[in-house]
Amino acid sequence: QMNNLPLGIDIVDHKDIEKKIRFIKINALKYTSETKKKFDLILFKQSIHFLKFKEIKKILRFSKKNLNSKGKIIILALHPKQNHWPLFRVFKTKLVKSLIKDKAILGLIKSSFKKYKINYFKFQVEMTKDSYLKMIKNRFTSCLLRLSHKELKNGIEEIKKKYKKKL
């Protein structure tokens, strides 16, 4: 049982707001540097890789400062080596580059904390190719965000030719 609703912070407004989480639209670096609140848990969900290394150092420092005495920081990220997604050429290039950065970020995180624990989990997913293509069209991962319309369209065609109906 929680006494307070969890707080979600993002730089974009969310349309699909979870009623069990209070969301505010603000830059996380700004919020963590200015807040006087203390937290039991600070969770970074697939977002830390959007920051520059200098910003990551700052946000980790501010986050540690904002923890209660037994508080925890959890950072969710992709496993740097075990990602088996159906990929098209440009997507693969972007993903490899992103995972290299994630590995460097992991090193930075390790050097920022005396005590840390790393857990990996494997989540096996089966879906239809059509469902996956819709996810690609919606740019479900940050690797797809900056692709041009043409690159995305060509990638979708590549996936259609390269993979079976069930992924």
Which positions does each model-derived feature cover?
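Class I SAM-dependent methyltransferase SAM/SAH-binding core
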Residues: 1-32
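A conserved beta-strand element that flanks and buttresses the S-adenosyl-L-methionine
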Residues: 43
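A short glycine-rich, Lys/Arg-flanked "PGG" loop and its adjoining helix->strand segment in the class I
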Residues: 57-72
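Conserved class I S-adenosyl-L-methionine
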Residues: 72-102
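Acceptor-substrate binding/catalytic loop of class I
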Residues: 90-106, 118-124, 142-149
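Short alpha-helix
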Residues: 97-113, 117, 126, 130, ...
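C-terminal helical/coil "lid" or tail adjacent to the Rossmann-like core of SAM-dependent
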Residues: 122-166
